[in-house]
């Protein structure tokens, strides 16, 4: 189960990173972001595309190096815990309908957080 979870995350983040790199205006618009200038687009590419690429590599390395799988699960717990917490705060402040397309990600992030919790508890080491 751990291998499937890590593989899913690696593929998920690789896909998002490629999408951000190939179509930054489309992806930022999909998220409700609009770069004000080329510097904003550069920042979007670095923060969204670059971070997603780094996460994809991290999860892929954890797949290849079993001794790092528990660390990858702990990262997932922290990552999705923070994302779900802040997205929940945004939903409560603004209304969940105001989250736009992020509502779809929110559901997936909750599932990935719950899976991370279950896997951390069940994985020795």
Regions found by a protein language model. Name each.
Residues 82-93:
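Transmembrane alpha-helical segments of integral membrane proteins
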Residues 96-108:
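Non-cytosolic membrane-interface motifs at loop->transmembrane helix junctions
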Residues 12-38:
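Hydrophobic transmembrane helix segments
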Residues 69-79:
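Membrane-interfacial loop-to-transmembrane alpha-helix junctions, especially the N-terminal start
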Residues 1-13:
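Cytosolic juxtamembrane helix and N-cap/initiation of the first transmembrane helix
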Residues 111-125:
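Membrane-water interface at the C-terminal end of transmembrane alpha helices
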Residues 40-63, 78-82:
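Core segments of alpha-helical transmembrane spans in multipass integral membrane proteins
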Residues 31-41, 66-71, 92-95:
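Short juxtamembrane and helix-loop transition motifs at transmembrane-helix boundaries
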